[in-house]
């Protein structure tokens, strides 16, 4: 057996083996709860801390003291890979001698020396093995992958030289994705910085003739926009936008449905320039600026905002921190905080003249366009990698 896509200098069949045969030890973290210490320096990690090949520590990561850490014997080395096996399944990370304590949702795989560690890391991402692992999951609410399944995982493996060649090639693809992701993060940070400067009026534009624009005026949202305008009769068929359809300003899902099959929440008939504001969990900021042709209807989970001002400026103003903080202050509920249309409409916004609105909207739109281009490049690179993983492994 050998893969569809192969470097020409290699031939011969790959060998069927198991992960256990290629490892010195496979185990998981502690099943007990350690004694947490807010002033502790050692992170207690779980599967969610395994991100894109590294251990990612965040503000929610529990910590323990050095004394607590000494109670547990973890046999890890530079030959160790981590795999998440409980709750979050399939996350991977290299161990780089960080001082961390493993929770039970982290499986450690100590590989033998005659293997390319990066090859095994990539192999475990392949569609073939991902499908196999997912088929072996147990549990209903919280999924679990047993250590026995991990140990007995079967796959075909080439000689070490071919492993290294494959790993080197695919690592270059990963590096490209990483560079694009970093660029995306930096542009997103730049946009946030620009929004802060623009909406705090730290940065002001001038009119085309060089004159100063008038001072901004404070107005309630309902005074500058119509909230949830009454819709005419809905069309017999339309594209439905619900709360799952939009993520960070991007329309990801377009569901074409018939009126007779439409959910009761399908009520907001959209017109170009409308802004959709997410009223449930608004901190997610999955709002949408609608500028498409055709029949679209949105869920009542959104507030539909229609204005005669620059609607793109209003869209950005709804993402400004001061506005969002006020929205959250008026929300009710804990797990799913929500604001009603009446409370939303009474929140005040600082409004410049129309010409300055347009200048601000144009600057932020230009940044968004660059971010979208990079997002598409990242997605294309990920799809390319997925195709390579499909063809370069058995």
Regions found by a protein language model. Give the residues of each.
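A short beta-sheet element
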Residues: 46-47, 57-127, 264-324, 338
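Non-catalytic DNA-recognition/assembly elements of restriction-modification systems
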Residues: 4-29, 152, 207-231, 346, ...
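Sequence-specific dsDNA recognition surfaces
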Residues: 20-33, 48-78, 222-233, 242-272
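Short, surface-exposed secondary-structure boundary micro-motifs
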Residues: 87, 169, 281, 363-365
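Short coil/turn segments at secondary-structure boundaries
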Residues: 32-39, 59, 136, 234-240, ...
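Short amphipathic coiled-coil heptad-repeat segments
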Residues: 1-11, 172, 177-218, 373-394
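A short glycine-rich beta-alpha junction/loop motif
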Residues: 3, 85, 100-107, 130, ...
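A generic structural signal for residues embedded in beta-strands
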Residues: 83-84, 172, 178, 277-278, ...
């Amino acid at each position: 057996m050998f893969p569809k896509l192969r470097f020409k200098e290699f031939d011969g069949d790959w060998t069927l083996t198991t992960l256990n045969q290629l490892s010195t030890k496979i185990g998981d973290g502690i099943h007990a709860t350690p004694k947490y210490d807010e002033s502790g320096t050692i992170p207690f990690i779980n599967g969610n801390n395994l991100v894109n090949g590294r251990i990612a520590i965040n503000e929610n990561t529990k910590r323990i003291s050095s004394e607590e850490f000494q109670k547990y014997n973890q046999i890890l080395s530079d030959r160790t890979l981590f795999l998440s096996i409980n709750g979050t399944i399939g996350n991977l990370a290299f161990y780089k001698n960080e001082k961390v304590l493993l929770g039970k949702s982290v499986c450690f795989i100590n590989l033998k020396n005659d293997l390319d560690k990066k090859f095994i890391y990539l192999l475990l991402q392949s569609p073939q093995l991902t499908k196999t692992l997912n088929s072996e999951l147990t549990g209903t609410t919280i999924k679990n992958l047993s250590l026995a399944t991990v140990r007995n995982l079967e796959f075909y493996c080439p000689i070490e030289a071919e492993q290294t060649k494959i790993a080197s090639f695919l690592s270059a693809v990963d590096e490209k994705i990483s560079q694009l992701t970093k660029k995306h993060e930096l542009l997103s940070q730049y946009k946030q910085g620009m929004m802060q400067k623009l909406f705090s009026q730290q940065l002001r534009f001038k009119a085309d003739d060089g004159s100063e624009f008038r001072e901004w005026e404070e107005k309630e949202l309902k005074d500058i926009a119509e909230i949830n305008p009454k819709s005419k009769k809905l069309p017999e068929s339309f594209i439905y936008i619900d709360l799952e359809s939009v993520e960070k300003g991007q329309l990801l899902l377009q569901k074409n449905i018939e009126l007779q099959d439409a959910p009761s929440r399908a009520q907001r008939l959209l017109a170009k320039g409308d802004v959709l504001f997410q009223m449930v969990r608004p901190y997610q900021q999955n709002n949408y600026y609608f500028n498409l042709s055709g029949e679209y209807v949105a869920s009542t989970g959104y507030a539909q905002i229609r204005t005669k001002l620059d609607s793109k400026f209003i869209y950005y103003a709804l993402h400004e921190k001061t506005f969002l903080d006020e929205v959250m202050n008026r929300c009710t509920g804990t797990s799913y905080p929500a604001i009603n249309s009446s409370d939303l409409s009474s929140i005040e916004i600082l409004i410049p003249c129309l010409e300055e609105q347009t200048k601000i909207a144009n600057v932020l739109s230009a940044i968004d366009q660059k971010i979208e281009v990079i997002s598409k490049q990242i997605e294309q690179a990920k799809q390319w990698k997925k195709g390579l993983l499909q063809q370069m492994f058995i």
